[in-house]
Amino acid sequence: MWFFIYAEDIENSNELRAKARPAHLARLEQLKNEGRLLLAGPHPLFDAENNVKDMSGSTIIASFDNLEEAQKWASEDPYWTEGVFKQGTAIVKPMNITAKMENASF
């Protein structure tokens, strides 16, 4: 089943985010290699197409067997364990995919 995972960054998270990013991306790559990752990405702090530095949070849509597995996976993400995400902002919910773009290019 697909799950929507979202969390907000703490203020001034850039340094912590940069430190935790390689391990965070490795976990996403593992989901991708297993065919379980639909999408993942950060939310820019402000609306600017070239804003790649200042982030306000992240979203992941991935497949897990159940809610508990999705919550456990999210809680073990380096962005959580290294303090990038603000406590109390996590959302992990089941999600039905009713439409998606085929061969989308990001």
Walk through the language-model features, giving the residues of each.
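Conserved, structured core segments of small domains
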Residues: 1-106
